[in-house]
Amino acid sequence: MLAVGPAMDRDYPQHEPPPAGSLLYSPPPLQSAMLHCPYWNTFSLPPYPAFSSDSRPFMSSASFLGSQPCPDTSYAPVATASSLPPKTCDFAQDSSYFEDFSNISIFSSSVDSLSDIVDTPDFLPADSLNQVSTIWDDNPAPSTHDKLFQLSRPFAGFEDFLPSHSTPLLVSYQEQSVQSQPEEEDEAEEEEAEELGHTETYADYVPSKSKIGKQHPDRVVETSTLSSVPPPDITYTLALPSDSGALSALQLEAITYACQQHEVLLPSGQRAGFLIGDGAGVGKGRTVAGVILENHLRGRKKALWFSVSNDLKYDAERDLRDIEATGIAVHALSKIKYGDTTTSEGVLFATYSALIGESQAGGQHRTRLRQILDWCGEAFEGVIVFDECHKAKNAGSTKMGKAVLDLQNKLPLARVVYASATGASEPRNMIYMSRLGIWGEGTPFRNFEEFLHAIEKRGVGAMEIVAMDMKVSGMYIARQLSFSGVTFRIEEIPLAPAFECVYNRAALLWAEALNVFQQAADWIGLESRKSLWGQFWSAHQRFFKYLCIAAKVRRLVELAREELARDKCVVIGLQSTGEARTREVLGENDGHLNCFVSAAEGVFLSLIQKHFPSTKRKRDRGAGSKRKRRPRGRGAKAPRLACETAGVIRISDDSSTESDPGLDSDFNSSPESLVDDDVVIVDAVGLPSDDRGPLCLLQRDPHGPGVLERVERLKQDLLDKVRRLGRELPVNTLDELIDQLGGPQRVAEMTGRKGRVVSRPDGTVAFESRAEQGLSIDHVNLREKQRFMSGEKLVAIISEASSSGVSLQADRRVQNQRRRVHMTLELPWSADRAIQQFGRTHRSNQVSAPEYVFLISELAGERRFASIVAKRLESLGALTHGDRRATESRDLSKYNFENKYGTRALHCVLTTILSQTENKVPVPQGYPGGVPTFFRDMKQGLLSVGIGGRESRNGCLDVEKDCSITKFLNRILGLEVHKQNALFQYFSDTFDHLIEMDKREGKYDMGILDLAPGIEEIYEESQQVFLAPGHPQDGQVVFYKISVDRGLKWEDAFAKSLALTGPYDGFYLSYKVRGNKPSCLLAEQNRGQFFTVYKPNIGRQSQLEALDSLRRKFHRVTAEEAKEPWESGYALSLTHCSHSAWNRHCRLAQEGKDCLQGLRLRHHYMLCGALLRVWGRIAAVMADVSSSSYLQIVRLKTKDRKKQVGIKIPEGCVRRVLQELRLMDADVKRRQAPALGCPAPPAPRPLALPCGPGEVLDLTYSPPAEAFPPPPHFSFPAPLSLDAGPGVVPLGTPDAQADPAALAHQGCDINFKEVLEDMLRSLHAGPPSEGALGEGAGAGGAAGGGPERQSVIQFSPPFPGAQAPL
């Protein structure tokens, strides 16, 4: 693809004039008339040259490649222009896509041919629309000057940080010099409407196939993606009473599908499991209790229930009691001695940590896992519940996770239920869900690693398909409470000047500490420094994290008091408590305190006191470890002389598995890989040493006189400086909050700490235990919760210790029914924790929905924590709710940097700063000292926080290979405020630039989009059904041709005009008369000087129109004057393109080609059904045709209310995709033919079977196999009503699995050999499972899988009066 780089005028690019006489050539003729159109797909490489000459159209440069948004406006979201821009530069646009430049995928294209391609267009601001030169202009401008980037600026508030939905999009621009055609001069106004966009994230949820139970007490929703696919038909009948009201219709539906899935055996021989992904507050506890009760009624009296805390045992008992299952006892494993298995029946309740418990008592090695297995027995078929199952994530890397897998493998027939609102936040965390049957024998993925690779390679779209496929297959259900009534807001908190001064001093002191630690390590000759630097950077991160939190305390207290004054109550979310430092100070002062403790100061002091390099530390390390041998081929380390004459900062991880647990028990961070031998030679201020001072020239002998004294003096000097700084550092956030909001008497604390510091009435400060008389510390949180719910206390502070399973909503059953205001002071570093905290105050049966307030400071370091949450939320929503935008609605997605774009942006930034390479992204505007100062300061700053590499021959620093986003964002916490904000801004500008590039090239994954949002006239023109391979049953995919009528009738336009009130709103007619008629439109003012335009042929134009452009080309008229041209244009555009309407002829039509310019009707192609099974095939075809394997997932709702979700197939790929599907279908049918052994004769003929008494029935007879068309049960009764899942669901309907007699009446030979083999398999499968033959077990009902069995023909008594065999 051609691309013209911008010419540069100092720091700003300018466009060069187009070559004189350049002409635009039409595309070569194609075979199918459908593929012809006057549009170009601008986002992918053509399969063959699109031009027949060397002359090329000139493309302007992009004007939005930086991260800064256009001025904030509030344009209503409209559909975007994915489709291919017309040759006249009429580029459809959409203001709703400033964050999501969706449609730039080739799979977001319209029906236009992929062969009609020109270079990627570039963009200019929307307010320049009236200046756009087109091929129809008489005098196109010779050149256009446009900035390559909108310059960045320092922090200016949250909304300015990333693009806003309410900002008008930039429009595509293309400057051409061709022979003018005056009669079509104004064709540029004909904006093509976009076919793809985002609509509502949620849809109201009502059980579609389960009709039992009473309505849920609150409104429940499902993501619109999951709501687009149906669940399987119900074949299981519950033994539970359905009319008692103890379980709602939603909960009974989940119980039904779980028990139905438990009737299925996977190809591995294990029983299939079920995932309950319901959000917090829907009632997962009662649902799980219902599954246990159902199995109890079926005779399975034992069950295992795993959760995160022993306290939740009381919630389990409450749930069983609420559903009237009082006869089921709950036994706490923690109260049972090792080796005791005397408990006979009931629920064994245990925590995940108990799974790895061991005991050596009595000289015998006992484990809890062995105890559980002994209690269950080898043939255990009861229920195993993994409640809050996200705690078992990382099963491949943690002992606890491996125990969860081991338990499932050793009890293969157990009925497993996974239950969690968060499920798995990343595909790799699904490893413990081995019973879902998504990977393994007989599935598209042989093992979990193959599944993981496929999903991560294909991005969020594949994750969304997984969720839909799981629901269709009957193994997954995910509903959540409606968020209607819930308000979200982000409170951006500016830093006080005094606080900023303290922060800057702390940053400088940490940079000095880095140098001091390095000097001390060099002086004593410390070799192994991995643990040292792990401790250093872990403490570094904690210290600045505490400062970030402390910056928000004052504002939070103000907000809390305001909300209390409005008769509301406040819930404050924290993650860490800082208790460890408090206990250290107590120990140092013999249990006495005279002031509040600073957690930040404690972290710094503890690091120096415990981990400062010393000879003792060297001896300890040397005695227990050996130096690793350098791998062959590695370069030599920095010379000893260099290391001795300057500080050597080794690039190391930010945390370590050996990190000090005493620093903060509530904090976690991920270990990073260590490159021991990467060194940066720095001087005392963190810069590369060129002029080394006298101190550095001293030869240091670790065993010589004075070395130990100098090291000790360095340590004491550093301690003194930290203590001086500590006088100004903020005190422990949790203690200060409780003190400011009224003390323990008015604040309910639900955290994991055992003591706190409080103010006494006389003004003194004292430490007190949280334990109360008659209560153990374990029960204090429950008592505090009761006080809050009763209204005794109106402020609650919760941490992770209380964020699972605790209900703090405005419940109708409690006294305190004030509206909850949930303030997140400290964003959890994990989305798992975030979702749990958000769900504490938004639950069923509440009087009012909560308000959420997220407090975020302007520190770049604070955004680091927000970015992690945003990443987890985005991925989480995609995987567990089928739609990543479900969690994006929590307003945190603006901070998502931890992805491939973040990695690329980071590499680009580091190479630019350290290696002095060129970067097209400008530095933040307004940085003191300008560009040279910016790069000098950033280089010094990066080195002062340990980010850098080896010095190359040209004097530049090589970029560290393994510097991750996490490390980068952790480390820049330690820069002065203005530096970290500038560096963070530069990073985010580069990040957005890379995303924009991918959007324009069609490589950006937008998730699931809506086809023709806001348009109701959508119809299915045709469908073709194909079989897809699977095990034990084959699936189906359906290829649809969709028609979209985007026109706007006069009646609808007139009704809309009646609601308009703006001074310039209303109908307009063009000054230019075309085809003896003026063009007509309806304009609606948005905000400022921009209007949304509606036209009779295309409906809402996604490009916003500027007021001056509107008034220059149109004049306002009354509705009566507009009616006739509107109706005429609407009728004519059904069959005639714009050229025919304007000029009474069309050049393309005269050449025998199809022209779609301005037509009302559009065609699209979709592939729906068992998409996971054909994903790889379709991606390969796409890559072959279009050089990109990205698949765009779309959804739509037709005129007759049918919903479809599937892969959008571009017009240019249709022929190849259909060819591949036909080959696949033929392969499946060939494989099925000998298995069925059931040839279809040309005419029905009776089958004479000996059936009298004493007659012998030859069950070994097998008629010869013949090719035959698929029997009726292979038809596709309803689109997407698929029961096809990976290895668990039959292809046909139950009616299709007829008995031999029924087949005989159909005139079809029976393969009795197959029937006999099926009988033998049933015999070898053993006796029916307990209760399986009871009501609702389904046909067959045996352990072999009931109605889901693999055999094509199920054996039943074939003759009247005959006895069932065996």
From Swiss-Prot:
UniProtKB keywords: Activator, Differentiation, Osteogenesis, Repressor, Transcription, Transcription regulation
Record Pfam families: AAA_34, Helicase_C_4, SBNO
Keyword Chaperone annotated: no
Cellular component, GO annotation: nucleus
GO annotation, biological process: bone mineralization; bone trabecula morphogenesis; cellular response to interleukin-11; cellular response to interleukin-6; cellular response to leukemia inhibitory factor; cellular response to lipopolysaccharide; macrophage activation involved in immune response; negative regulation of DNA-templated transcription
Induction remarks: Up-regulated by interleukin IL6 and soluble interleukin receptor IL6R in astrocytes.
Residues covered by region (Disordered): 1-24, 174-217, 614-640, 1324-1366
Protein family (similarity comment): Belongs to the SBNO family.
Function recorded in the entry: Acts as a transcriptional coregulator, that can have both coactivator and corepressor functions. Inhibits the DCSTAMP-repressive activity of TAL1, hence enhancing the access of the transcription factor MITF to the DC-STAMP promoter in osteoclast. Plays a role in bone homeostasis; required as a positive regulator in TNFSF11//RANKL-mediated osteoclast fusion via a DCSTAMP-dependent pathway. May also be required in the regulation of osteoblast differentiation. Involved in the transcriptional corepression of NF-kappaB in macrophages. Plays a role as a regulator in the pro-inflammatory cascade.
Subunit structure: Interacts with TAL1; this interaction inhibits TAL1 occupancy of the DCSTAMP promoter, leading to the activation of the DCSTAMP promoter by the transcription factor MITF.
The protein's name in its UniProt record: Protein strawberry notch homolog 2
